[in-house]
Amino acid sequence: MYEAVYAHPDGDSTVARHALTAADSEYDGIVVRNHGDEQADYDADAISDAYGVDVAAGIEVRADDPSRASGFVGNYRSDRTVVVVHGGDRRINRFAVEQPTVDVLAHPMRDDGDFNHVLANAAADNGVRVEFDFGPVLRASGGSRVRAIKELRKLRELVENAGAPFVVSASPSTHLQIRAPRDIIAVGETIGFDADTVREGLTEWGQIVERNRERQSGAVIEPGVRLEDDADDAE
């Protein structure tokens, strides 16, 4: 299972500190999902070797309109393992779920964002994961927490009905906000998610990383078609 983190300068903790806490929390890896204007400077391989967790380079595209978002996605797709689109705007939500090159639509219900069955079906058709962001449930209180729970339940129902793919995250911006998978699963169960759904959502980040690394390596010509090494042919 993986967690997707915001590291310094987009958060308060370095990538290395996030990785250490993730390892202690029994994650297999982290995705560094900083926004494009606040990217982190880090050596993923060195950190991975030091702490025994995978460190995947991601990006969270944040834009005011779909045309700019499209340009950013195109710019980052070839060199980032995970491409996330910062949701919460109705136009951006729609753009993201209609783009097969987008891996994840993040927090689509945030701010004045909305998500409906049409967008859920588009996400299913294009293989775009919808994020269940548990961060507000873990960190908000009072009316804000109640609203966050209500929005997550609505989002879960839409995603389930459409059969759309999804990820789960606590969206930590500091290592102190990282919660162990068992804790996130427990929180999910208290707000109406079953344990298997939360576990699947945490695992899906790693599936994205594995699939995209394979594609970037050139081993995949098109979905379902792989290049085999000469060594394999010789066996």
UniProtKB/Swiss-Prot annotation:
Alphabetical list of Gene3D superfamilies matching this protein: Metal-dependent hydrolases
Signal peptide from the UniProt entry: none
Pfam families named among the record's database cross-references: RNase_P_p30 (PF01876)
Keyword annotations from UniProtKB, A to Z: Cytoplasm, Endonuclease, Hydrolase, Nuclease, tRNA processing
Subcellular location as annotated: Cytoplasm
A molecular function GO annotation: ribonuclease P activity
One Gene Ontology cellular component: ribonuclease P complex
Biological processes per GO annotation: tRNA 5'-leader removal
Annotated EC: 3.1.26.5
Predominant localisation class: cytoplasm
InterPro entries assigned: Pol/histidinol_Pase-like, RNase_P_comp-3_arc, RNase_P_p30
Subunit composition and interactions: Consists of a catalytic RNA component and at least 4-5 protein subunits.
Sequence similarity: Belongs to the eukaryotic/archaeal RNase P protein component 3 family.
Protein name: Ribonuclease P protein component 3
Provenance organism: Haloarcula marismortui (strain ATCC 43049 / DSM 3752 / JCM 8966 / VKM B-1809)
